Amino acid sequence: MSEIPAKTLKRRGALSREFLSGDGIEVGALHHPLALGPHARVRYVDRYDIEGLRWHYPELGGYDLVPVDVVDDGETLSTFRDGELDFLIANHFLEHTENPIGTIRNHLRAVRQGGRLYFAVPNKHDSFDRARPRTPFEHLVADDRDGPGRSRADHYREWVRLIEKRVEPAEVEARVDFLMSINYSIHFHVWDARSFGDFLDRPRTYLDNAFDIEHLSANGAEIVAILKKRDPASPRPRLWIPVKVDKLRRFLSTHGADWKGRARTMRAALGGATRASTGRRAS
């Protein structure tokens, strides 16, 4: 696993201080927990305890890992009650989930009305995923509807061929069988700035407008999104125009790290068609 640049970590911390407060969790923090402000308290959740993580990720042998306070599946969070949390952090986690839409649904369940989800995913163009195709939204819907087992082996084959660069069919299948047998955590899904913006917009309707997109920006080689859980009785959320997201991608690449206070510039970049939040203090 590569090191995260200090500038990226600094920007993450600034966003967390702006948006996150109260009691929350971070899923899969490993050796890079999110820096939080003084009004936020966090517990760390992972699918293995420290010993299990050390076995599963031998490449992290030289790093200090955060303590695992709760052992749970970060996709389902079955140990957490509905509305128990003020916030949930999952950096570089969604791409590892087999059912990202179902994961967002479960994460929303675990936070209170007005609670926030803080996500970061790698931009495929700036990562080892650059040779892989973007995951279509229709594929994600099928994984949610039919279960991720339908596509699991195909994801591992793509990983073995395009990331591990194995080409012999017998070798590929043997490697796929091994990785699946140990439930190795690959990047099941791939996004860039354009497709991730579209991915967040379309599930809003698919999930009955359960959240607002409060923040979306480029942050070095990653894309950061902050979602706010809506009260079902509140007015419909602000529009987010996916057909303009190619312009949004160019805007983010130029202005992403300084989005707050640029609403007028952003509306111009998007042709005046959208009203996206420029950020609010945590409440």
Whereabouts are the PLM-identified features?
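Conserved alpha-helix/loop element of class I SAM-dependent methyltransferases that forms part
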Residues: 2-23, 30-33
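Membrane-proximal basic amphipathic "stem/tether" segments
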Residues: 1-11, 241-283
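S-adenosyl-L-methionine-dependent methyltransferase catalytic module, highlighting the catalytic core
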Residues: 71, 102-108, 113-253, 257-261
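Hydrophobic beta-strand segment of the Class I
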Residues: 88-89
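Class I SAM-dependent methyltransferase SAM/SAH-binding core
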Residues: 22-77
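Hydrophobic adenine-recognition pocket in adenosine-nucleotide-binding enzymes
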Residues: 93-94, 121
